[in-house]
Amino acid sequence: MRKSRAIAAAIASLSLVVAACGGDEETAPTESSAETTSAETTPAETTPGETTPAETTPGEVDYMWTPNADVLAGAEGQVNIVAWPGYIEDGSTAPEYDWVTPFETITSCQVNVRVGATSDEMVQLMQSGEYDGVSASGDATQRLMSGGEVAEIDLAEYTSYADIFDGLKDKPWNSLDGKPYGIPHGRGANVLVYNTEAFPDGLDTWAPMWEAGSVAEGAVSVYDSPIYIADAALWLMATQPELGITNPYALDQTQFDAAIALLESQEAIAGQYWADYVVQAGSMVDGTLLAGTTWQVVANFAEGEGAKIATTKPAEGATGWSDTWMLSTKAANPNCMKLWMDWISSPWANAQATEYFGEAPSNRKGCALTANADHCTMFHAEDEDYWTDVWYWTTATEECLDGRTDVTCVPYTEWVNAWNALRA
């Protein structure tokens, strides 16, 4: 999923450049683990508008976090986590971005991270039982919850949860049967990017992504992932209401077939299918991309490199994501994982992590702590109205997510098969 967000260390630092200047396939796990041991690294304290090294020993008050005393007392000494690139940083990529060292100092839990490249890989890794927890996207969370790989959590053990934006709590991608299964990390929308010379009057519609005859024909950039089928369904929601689609992740066979047919027709106008967002940013800069689906952080970087582009969330709405930190049912170090989940969602750490990656924080107090004072405005962190027509990535299931019981919906495994056939 978005995750060919598979940014290597150098790619992950792309969002640092932004701050300074203003598809899954069924793959086998790869050996890309990294052990984070930062005992000799000076932790970084961030205040609004600047990034400076901390002058005090890491502690609860400095980092706006008071861990649950009982959980802290049971800390095992280490934690093994599967995470997206850029979500767990110890200062080795960029010294000023280090939210691992303070955590290790406060909790005595050494952080060991296995970087995941795709949601499918991360599900496989969690099924191995070797990891204590994971940062999971919505196309993985349902599989993990229904498969018994992750545990229901006791919110009383998480002191940071009260400050999470209400719009991220109790959602289908982080809860099951009304019970919480994780802590929200952040959120982002998949926005429309367009070349301002090709569209001097601006754009407020996804039409150039789907319809022939626009100036963007042949220069359309498409996200290369099965979850993009939801984007096709979103367009059909707006343009073919007779199909009855009310949720782009709840498609019966007729609706699904219509989405695939639309994607097949899109091939004639597409100029690029992207998974590596650095490649897409290059297309924005060199002008070979005239319209596309992107993430705001990619557009920010490209604009800083001189790309003549603008972004918008079109009138039809958009898909998006909200990742969730989850605890393994087989965790060997459950208390250290609980502490990490609470820490990474606390104001200071959440501000650091989400600004580094380029997304809206999940903790409302984090907005006062980002190095770029405009970060939360740029990513609409506090604008709940912005998110009302953003359909967060969710795993499609046979049980229709829109509440219908008279039909069976197409499960995500079939989305993967259909996408692979389309791209073949």
Kindly give the residue locations of the regions a language model identified.
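Extracytoplasmic ligand-binding site segments that recognize negatively charged/polar headgroups
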Residues: 80-95, 130, 135-283, 288
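Periplasmic-binding protein-like
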Residues: 160-163, 260-266, 305-329
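C-terminal motif of bacterial Sec signal peptides marking the signal peptidase cleavage site
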Residues: 15-20
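A bilobed periplasmic-binding-protein/Venus flytrap-type ligand-binding module shared by bacterial periplasmic
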Residues: 191-198, 234-236, 321-333, 352-356
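Early extracytoplasmic/lumenal segment of secretory-pathway proteins
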Residues: 21, 58-143
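Bacterial lipoprotein signal-peptidase II cleavage site
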Residues: 21-31
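Mature extracytoplasmic/periplasmic domains
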Residues: 327-393
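Conserved C-terminal helix/tail region of periplasmic/extracytoplasmic solute-binding proteins
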Residues: 282, 388-424
